[in-house]
Amino acid sequence: MFSFEKNSLKNTDKEIFDAIELEVKRQHEHVELIASENYASPAVMEAQGSQLTNKYAEGYHGKRYYGGCEFVDIAEKLAIERAQQLFGVDYANVQPHSGSQANAAVYNAVLKPGDTVLGMDLGAGGHLTHGSKVNFSGKIYNSIQYGLDENGDIDYEQVAQLAKEHKPKMIIAGFSAFSGIINWQKFREIADSVDAVLMADIAHVAGLVAAGVYPNPFPYVYVATTTTHKTLRGPRGGLILCNNNPELAKKFQSAIFPGIQGGPLMHVIAAKAVAFKEALEPSFVDYQKQVLKNAKAMEKVLKQRGINIISGGTSNHLLLLDITNTGFSGKEAEAALGRANITVNKNSIPNDPRSPFVTSGLRIGSPAITTRGFKEKECELVANLLADVVFNCGDEKVENETAAKVLDLCDKFPVYK
């Protein structure tokens, strides 16, 4: 028998308890600019930390291989129904443990080993699972990669040319570091010209799509995958969506279970359901609109400060910064900003001469700071502070002065009260 008091984390494992406390302190004291990060609500965290973690539930709701699933079935059914409503589709699989797992399941459902896949190059802003040679997607399948044009937009002419030349079985439209708007219709026209399945990876923009402030990939795509954190502000996990295609939906269902996963994480699925309910509220639309405004506010200041933005600016929540002209690498800038209580991630830029471990760029985004309550005024300040540090990496005085300003700002906008 367990006692919530006697067997608390603090009493049971002080090392882990202390590590969590330090992370809570870091999250309060640092401005979070990593584009793929956000803050989950107390309700989401409560569901994820619930006793649902104890329940094994192989299979799908109503069709389990274990008894005692009648209540976790409620949670999964709610998650599915809310996801369908949120994205306007008739099929949602809420069981993928991550976005990468969701992608892997789609590949397994649609492709055979050795089939050709056309996806965005990692160096141009794509994701590892879009065909990178170091990832399963580039090892199991014949991966062909497209990039950006001279204006920093997706090179649709190249996509069409590569599709015509290589006849891919599937084309992936999606990104992890691209600040533009994807033309889903143009991708569909290219896919149809070679009889390819079109898949959208909307992991970064799912919240924007759900709120109607970024183009919805349906009805142009056959299937969309996403994570459930990032702009969706839920727990870390994955999601598969499709519409008006029961044959494909059946394949995705079996591709997840028993294809690549066993028991689903019912506590995470419950947390997904909570996040989807939150995303269906009118306030979520207001939040996503502010995400876009805040990204544009940072763009304006960074341009004024002489920092180059790949693609010329942003039309979503993220900005990819080329900091070559500062004389410092992405690795150096990330470390310096960390000392100044600003969290970013180093990121390769198109045709980057530096390795992915060093880079010439930084990727920043507005979802987390918007959740925190920042508006344009605060984001302009943050962008100026970022520029102060990036042009003066290693200057202890600049870093310390910036950290003090960041701490003052963070105290005014606590993440959790």
Curated annotation (Swiss-Prot):
GO CC annotation: cytosol
Site keyed Plays an important role in substrate specificity: positions: 229
Residues that hold (6S)-5,6,7,8-tetrahydrofolate according to the record: 122, 126-128, 355-357
One GO biological process term: glycine biosynthetic process from serine
Catalysed reactions listed for this entry: (6R)-5,10-methylene-5,6,7,8-tetrahydrofolate + glycine + H2O = (6S)-5,6,7,8-tetrahydrofolate + L-serine
Keyword list, A-Z: Amino-acid biosynthesis, Cytoplasm, One-carbon metabolism, Pyridoxal phosphate, Transferase
UniProt GO molecular function: glycine hydroxymethyltransferase activity; pyridoxal phosphate binding
Job description of the protein: Catalyzes the reversible interconversion of serine and glycine with tetrahydrofolate (THF) serving as the one-carbon carrier. This reaction serves as the major source of one-carbon groups required for the biosynthesis of purines, thymidylate, methionine, and other important biomolecules. Also exhibits THF-independent aldolase activity toward beta-hydroxyamino acids, producing glycine and aldehydes, via a retro-aldol mechanism.
Protein name: Serine hydroxymethyltransferase
Protein species of origin: Francisella tularensis subsp. mediasiatica (strain FSC147)
